[in-house]
A protein has these predicted regions:
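Charge-rich, low-complexity N-terminal segments
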Residues: 1-150
Length: 150
């Protein structure tokens, strides 16, 4: 069984070497959707009985480790000197998040997966795991990151 829960952020970025308008500073209403797999809790009388995990617990993790980090912030690649200088001109009050990758939807999906995965825990032994993170950049554009199973 799988369940999904999402958070949305208003976040700026740019793709510095892009052939089109994405190379300019701009923003999106991102949706980060966690997909969790596991067994339904069968322990009688517990709060999560009949669930994989309480949706509010997933929301708390997504809010803390994704939303609160990049909402109303500008995500900039550490190698994008122009964008970093532009952000620095706005001073310390500007929310800038410097990352070691170009902030495409694909890379942000992986970043969010890695931020959230350690915090998905199985309280009742139902072996929960984050199987995918979906990053919707626009209503028509969604990237998904899944770890390779070995």
């Amino acid at each position: 069984t799988t369940i999904r829960r999402y958070v949305e952020t208003d976040t700026g970025h740019r793709v510095p070497n892009h052939k089109s308008k994405c190379r300019h500073l701009h923003g999106h209403r991102y949706r980060f959707e966690a997909e969790i797999e596991g067994d339904v809790v069968t322990v009688s009388g517990v709060s999560d009985e009949g669930m994989l995990m309480d949706f509010s617990d997933i929301s708390r993790v997504l809010m803390e480790h994704v939303h609160d980090v990049i909402d109303h912030a500008f995500v900039v690649y550490e190698g994008d000197e122009e964008a970093r200088r532009a952000c620095e001109l706005m001073g310390d009050e500007h929310r800038t998040v410097v990352v070691p990758f170009i902030p495409t939807a694909e890379n942000l999906a992986k970043w969010a997966f890695e931020a959230v995965a350690p915090h998905i825990s199985s309280t009742y032994g139902n072996k929960l795991r984050l199987v995918a993170m979906h990053c919707r950049e626009t209503p028509k554009s969604i990237a998904t990151w899944r770890p390779k199973l070995t």
